[in-house]
């Protein structure tokens, strides 16, 4: 058996999340079917991913691995599998890796970017690709509140009731808020994320930005470890899985591909 790592992007608005579902249109099901068609067997090939995205969440760079008996050049994987995929999913690169590589467990960190449009009316050209807030936001207060979340914490106040993670402790190493014209760009990096963690953090930051809660509320919410005390879960529309960090020994290509796709906002 050969293990192949694949880097891909997708428009999450077309799909009911990454993970396979019995009666759902998911990225995983569609990719595995395309891999089966490319292999010539017609039977879906099982994949494992770096991070399972929810319904409506996009990926500028997702990484998966697949075990196969096929012997093909990297470019054949890219062009061949893309030929069986819809336009909302695209393979960017492929690389043969050793059995010691695992798309999920070998990853050292994941980075998400959230694009938020600030404007009086919703942006039609950014429908499903950016979140929207029409109220004025105190960006300074939001940045101050974000500092309370950096480091290793129990993020129970920011996990969904459906979260299947074995424990709620995560290490958040980055939470930046940049202003890019009418957009606010939120960049979050952690060793891993809980279900709805980024969207629940976004909800809390917006409560503070709108003056509904104080800057200190973020720290008290974190200490409470109670999701019922948090803000509503924010829209998935502007959320992008943008980068996966792996040890250099795996020599994976174009791991900054997601950052490149979002470069007008993150540069």
UniProtKB/Swiss-Prot annotation:
CDD domains the record matches: PseudoU_synth_EcTruA
Active site residues of this protein: 54 (nucleophile)
Keyword tRNA processing: yes
Molecular function GO labels: RNA binding; tRNA pseudouridine(38-40) synthase activity
Claim: tRNA processing is one of the keywords in the record: yes
Catalytic activity: uridine(38/39/40) in tRNA = pseudouridine(38/39/40) in tRNA
EC number(s) recorded for this UniProt protein: 5.4.99.12
Keywords per UniProt: Isomerase, tRNA processing
Family: Belongs to the tRNA pseudouridine synthase TruA family.
Protein name as it appears in the record: tRNA pseudouridine synthase A
Organism: Bordetella avium (strain 197N)
